[in-house]
């Protein structure tokens, strides 16, 4: 049955953030909180890469021959056919990339190395107001426990 009184009774799960308002009888008190009866199994997630945007051929005509692409491509290669094929004949995609040896031939300079790294420092959940003042507990220390 939920998390009971939470973090100290008056803060996160007691009378402040989770008392009689947001979490007393719901989020952290007697409701769905983090009780064992409400824990489900794993959440399956399926992801897919974004569609390539560098080369596109869309037509109702017939294309024969080769298409040459030179440069740095973000994907190893994709090909797709959309539309309807006639009831007679064949339709296919033949895709080739070099000699089959795939490797990274160029890497950028700094990438993600240099940049702002505030993370959890002084913002929403760090040492600042966070959940503490107003939304969570009476005084708060940033984590919502109240004091």
Swiss-Prot record:
Q: Name one GO biological process term.
A: chorion-containing eggshell formation
> Residues annotated as region 4 X 5 AA tandem repeats of G-Y-G-G-L?
11-30
Region annotated Left arm, chain positions: 1-38
Query: What's a single GO MF annotation on this record?
Result: structural constituent of egg chorion
Q: Name one GO cellular component term.
A: egg chorion
Report residue spans for region: Central domain.
39-107
Q: Which UniProt keywords apply?
A: Repeat
Q: Where is this region: Right arm (Gly-rich tandem repeats)?
A: 108-147
Keyword Mitochondrion assigned: no
Q: Which Pfam families match?
A: Chorion_1 (PF01723)
* sequence repeat ranges per the UniProt record: 11-15, 16-20, 21-25, 26-30
* InterPro entries, per database record: Chorion
* Family per record: Belongs to the chorion protein family.
Q: What exactly does this protein do?
A: This protein is one of many from the eggshell of the silk moth.
**What is the official name of this protein in its record?**
Chorion class B protein B.L1
Q: What is the lineage of its organism?
A: Eukaryota, Metazoa, Ecdysozoa, Arthropoda, Hexapoda
């Amino acid at each position: 049955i939920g998390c009971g009184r939470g973090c100290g009774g008056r803060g996160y799960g007691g009378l402040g953030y989770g008392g009689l308002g947001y979490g007393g009888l719901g989020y952290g008190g007697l409701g769905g909180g983090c009780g064992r009866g409400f824990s489900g199994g794993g959440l399956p997630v399926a992801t897919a890469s974004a569609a390539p945007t560098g080369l596109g051929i869309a037509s109702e005509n017939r294309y024969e021959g080769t298409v040459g692409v030179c440069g740095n491509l973000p994907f190893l290669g994709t090909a797709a056919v959309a539309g309807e094929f006639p009831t007679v004949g064949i339709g296919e995609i033949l895709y080739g990339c070099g000699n089959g040896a795939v490797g990274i031939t160029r890497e950028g300079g700094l990438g993600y190395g240099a940049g702002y790294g505030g993370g959890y420092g002084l913002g929403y959940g760090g040492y600042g107001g966070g959940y503490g003042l107003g939304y969570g507990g009476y005084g708060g220390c940033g984590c919502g426990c109240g004091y």
